[in-house]
Amino acid sequence: MSFSVNSSQQISIFDATANLTQREIKMLEKSWAKYFAENIFPAIDEEPFKVLYSDRPSRHNTPVNVIIGALIIKEIFQLTDEEIVETLPFDIRYQYALHTTSFEEQPLNDRTLGRFRARCNTYEERTGIDLIHQCIVGLSSEMAKMMKINTGMRRMDSLMVASSIKKMSRLELLYTCVANLAKFMHKSEDGAFPKSLIHYTEEDDHNRVLYHNRSEDTESKITQVLKDAARIITACGSRYDESSEYQLLIRVIEEQTDKEPDGNLILKSGKSDMNSELLQNPADPDATFRAKAGKDYRGYIANVVETADKNNSIAVDYQFEKNIYSDSQFVKDYLDKQPVSEEETILVTDGGYCGYENVKQAAEKKVHLITTDLKGADVADIYADFKFSEDGKEIISCPAGHRPKSNVYDINTQKCKASFPIEQCKGCPHFAECNPQLHVRVATIKLAKRTSYHAEQQRFFKTEKFKEYAHFRNGVETIPAALRKRHNVDKMPVRGLIRCRLYFGFKVVAMNVRKLVKYMSRLGKCALTPEIA
């Protein structure tokens, strides 16, 4: 299948809108479809998706902008693939939005969307390039311009995204991995399949082993499952090394068990070797575990960057990772991608993104990073008045304006040890606050630039300007709520990091389109229909 750009859509004399009455045309032009057709659809850049198709002359692809537009509409209305495909031929609003009113036959079938997603996922697995992310960020930037939002003010927040998997006990996890491999070998009619494990292929065996189970039987059943695991791994040899069932069983055995001197497998005891990256459920090998705010989460974490003004906001960037990813790493990744801007951009976040290194990195990109909280204990206020060199390796002056006699920088602690004449320090009004260490001739103080920055931020938190920034940041809390309640982000019908990332991206842009339509309706140019009100 070769790539072809769907850059122009010529209207035919048999166009679906030709038979509409004036009243029907007026209703169509007041609907969401008109604005989608005139602004969103033309902004979809098809060219980056050329790499998904063959260079050889062959049948042309289904228009990429039609596919992406359909996937966005699908998320706006929370439709399944089947519903969007079956609705398109009969709902003129969908055709109008996707510029297909003149098509003799609508270009989507029951496999179009799934195959396109598979192409994008495979390309990302091979190259690490997320074409959908690039497309959505570009669309969101255009929407921000349409809404005339000041992009110099941004805010950031993260949200946990649940994987659609159940919590498994260690017995169930081990049993499921053994059963999956047993069923795979049995289906392959492998003569080496141990006959003693045939019960794993029976439909009721799962319930018999796991649910018809007394608590005192659990240990003996785990022992038996581990023996069965060792037996089936031996029977596999090297023939199943590439199968996911075999790889997952090997993974769970390595993560959950130790080998005794006699070769038998036993469960690991204690939590010393347990970590968040352990397999949670073989149905989603990418899902990880994280405890946050007293709750346990299994799945992923997303980070969203929103630009906003007094009345409007648009999510202009996002990132989707395993849920062991930290907020601090999210802001580092975001700053790495940003070009050095001509004018300063303000980025307001919560305390999870704080850190002196993050502030320094942001400053290099002309981004003023403001966090609404700080990690660690409060420090002495006087530390804010110490002046450091640009690289933070030398104290230039103390709060009284005196230069130190000498400076020694400790690379391990990143602290400067500054020495001042002892009489000078004793006669200083800040002597008690600084609390230097006294020697025979000098008084010394050890201080890191990050500690001085911490003290500066403590002062800043008491200002009216900070209260304005904190109020601005609070607005980003609506994004997790909207994605959960309206776009069902915790109930995505796919598993795996890359697949979930693609779905999440379309939920973000669908949220943005809804905001754009509401913005236009306030201007009197477009009206929301009841379906998306």
For each predicted feature, which ranges?
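Short basic-aromatic helix/loop recognition motifs at nucleic-acid
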Residues: P57-N61
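Anion-binding and metal-coordination hotspots
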Residues: T80-E83, L88, S102, Q106, ...
